[in-house]
Design a protein with these regions (language model features):
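Alpha/beta-hydrolase fold catalytic core
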Residues: 2-84, 107-110, 150
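Conserved SAM-binding loop
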Residues: 66, 87, 115, 156, ...
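Tryptophan-centric aromatic hotspots in well-structured domains and transmembrane helices
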Residues: 60-61, 74, 94-95, 131, ...
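Short, hydrophobic alpha-helix immediately C-terminal to the catalytic nucleophile
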Residues: 99, 141, 165-169
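Conserved hydrolase catalytic core segment
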Residues: 109, 150-189
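Conserved HGGG/HGGXW glycine-rich cap/lid loop of the alpha/beta-hydrolase fold
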Residues: 72-122
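Solvent-exposed, non-membrane alpha-helical residues enriched in polar/charged side chains
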Residues: 49, 53-54, 103, 141, ...
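Active-site loop/oxyanion-hole signature of alpha/beta-hydrolase fold enzymes
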Residues: 69-70, 114-156
Length: 189
């Protein structure tokens, strides 16, 4: 009986320590790029992909950061030219998730924009307390407005559904079509 109580107390203490470690707020980790990428709307900080990531995409991709707020950089992959198609991954993936979709599209007629949410992939890592839906919506909207998108088709899944649709709701008139998969979101009140 005493052994059972001791083991139970030890397990409870370990659980408390594990929870404290998991929920603590960490420091912001800001990625660094190298060089510049030129787009029609301006120059951005280039990010050369590591070999393992570069090996799974075709030529023609641009990899860069958009600083949406001081110290908050979002990594963006894009490929193609033409009508903007904004795709938003879920958790815990990255914009690289949509590379196989992009490979099937007519890249001479569409521009596939694949941002990676803050906290994931090569984007800035933030404290747990900063991961709110409102923050992610605002940051992704800043990506879209920085790229000066006046219209786009959107596809998103998982957590990318509410983040992407929320980001687009902050720029009325941009959304021209949507494919929302394996997600949920609520309408504004």
């Amino acid at each position: 009986m005493r052994t059972t109580i001791k083991v139970g107390a030890l397990l409870a203490a370990l659980l408390v320590v594990a929870v404290l470690v998991l929920v603590q707020d960490g420091e912001r980790i800001i990625p660094e790029g190298e060089g510049r990428v030129e787009l029609d709307v301006g120059e951005f900080e280039a990010f050369p992909l590591p070999d393992y990531a570069a090996a799974v995409i075709s030529d023609g991709y641009k990899s860069y950061f958009i600083e949406v707020e001081p110290g908050i950089k979002i990594h963006v992959l894009e490929v193609g030219q033409g009508y903007p198609v904004y795709v938003q991954h879920g958790n815990p993936t990255t914009g690289l998730l949509y590379r196989k979709v992009a490979a099937l599209l007519p890249l001479d007629r569409v521009r596939v924009i694949m941002p990676t949410m803050v906290g994931l992939g090569y984007s800035t890592k933030i404290a747990a307390s900063e991961h709110t839906l409102d923050n992610h919506m605002r940051w992704m909207n800043r990506v879209l407005t920085t790229l000066e998108l006046t219209e786009a088709v959107y596809a998103g899944q998982d957590w990318g559904g509410p983040v992407g649709m929320g980001a687009l709701s902050l720029s009325p008139g941009v959304l021209k079509g949507a494919v929302v998969m394996n997600t949920g979101f609520r309408a504004p009140r």
